[in-house]
Amino acid sequence: YENGKKQKYAMFSFGFPNYLETEEGFAAYNEYKCGLLSPKILKTYAGRVLANDLSLKNSFCAVYNSLLEYFPKNDAWTLTLRAKRGLSDTSKPGAFTKDHIYLKGFLNVKKYAERGGDIKKLYIGKIGIEHVPLLKYII
């Protein structure tokens, strides 16, 4: 937001369509580059994706029991709770699916960097990787 406010156009602070995946992934990528993205955090990101997927098809109890195969009780509970948050009846299938963007975004930003993408351009504001080619026409 702050970097976006420094740009000529407000859209850089309000956000381009679908910017959030890149923004969250870029934050995780920066943690990774600084050596702060531990295997435990990555496992949590993956667990959130799994919990989201399971929640779309199952009840709270079924999701929790499935996650116990991969996570300790407290972690399985927290992952299930996050995936089912906001639902009025957690016994039914459904999920708050925003949490999948952290892992997906991280992997996309990492791939972008590994393929020679200009990481510095992602600091410009709330943009997605797919918007980087458009910057030459805007800035």
Predicted regions located by residue number:
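Post-HExxH zinc-binding segment in Zn-dependent metallohydrolases
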Residues: 2-51, 105
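Conserved alpha-helical "signature site"
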Residues: 39-139
